[in-house]
Amino acid sequence: MKKILFFLSLVITVGCTRAQNVASIQNIPDYRILDADSVYRTPANLKKNQPVMIVYFSPDCSHCQHLMNEIKGQMKNFSKMQIVMVSAVDYRMIKGFYKDFGIAAYPNITVGTEGNTYKVLQYYNVKTTPYIAIYNHRHKLLKAYEKAPKIEELAAIVKKA
């Protein structure tokens, strides 16, 4: 009986903690990233009334690379989405990722580093990459993923945005 009570209290605690995290990320974080063109970008650069997908990633993460390839392959589903890819790695790695994946061909994708500020990392409490947060056209959270979902699920949420 004690084990059951302990398990139930653990489930409730984890559930409440998770609910608090979702409530705390309802808005787009106040970030400042250095993009691949050596320009600093902030949320002020985002277009109004257009949905946003923030992806916290690492250029050398195989799951992140796979996600990028899948998004590129389904770009027709993501073309109206502003995609902001943020990392804490060195600028040279960001530049390499940008070039390797031909991101210059996709004007709706911004890739940048937050350097050692870790503001976005801490805002989302990122534990693994890629971390994805999708915001609607009013820039309010629709869905957050702690790991990459299937591209079909991601595309379906993007359509709702």
Locate the predicted segments by residue:
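Short, internal strand/loop/helix patches
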Residues: 101-129, 133
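Thiol-/selenol-based redox modules, centered on thioredoxin-like
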Residues: 128, 136-161
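Structural microenvironment flanking redox-active thiols in thiol-disulfide oxidoreductases
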Residues: 65-103, 118-120
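A short beta-strand-turn-helix
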Residues: 31-51
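Short active-site neighborhood of thiol/selenol oxidoreductases, capturing the structured segment around
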Residues: 44-65, 71
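Bacterial Sec-dependent N-terminal signal peptides
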Residues: 1-25, 161
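Short, small/polar residue-rich loop motifs at catalytic or cofactor-binding pockets
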Residues: 27, 50, 127-129
